Amino acid sequence: MKSIGVVNFSSKPGSVELQEIEYPLFGDDDVIMQVEAVSVCGSDLHQWHGTNSWEVNYPVVLGHEFCGVIKELGKNVKSAGKWQLGDRVVTETAAVIDTDSPLSRQGKYNLDPSRK
C-alpha cells in the first residue's frame, strides 16, 4: 500500500517534493492511523529552507504534527485494550528528551527546558 508524503530529500534549500511512499511493514505492536490534518511547524520550514541546526537523515517526511483516526490495531495493541478502532488521536513529538532530568522522571518531559 502507498501514500503521498512531503519529502525533504537533501540539505539543499527547496529540496522538497511530493512522493509516493510505501507503507512500512505492520507488526503486532503497531497502529495505523488515517491522518486527517497536518500542521506546518517551524522545524519543517527550517528543513525546507535548508537552515536546520540539527542532524537529519535524508530523505525525511515532513509534517510531524498531525491528528487522525485509528484504522488498524496490531494484535498486542488490541489485547492491551487501551485503544479502539475509530479513536481520535494526535501526535506529540520532540527531537531530544533528557530521560534523566527530574521533570522527565516525573513524566513531565514536555516541561523540561532542555527538550528540543
Indicate where each model-derived feature is located.
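NAD(P)H dinucleotide-binding glycine-rich loop of Rossmann-like/cofactor-binding domains
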Residues: 95-116
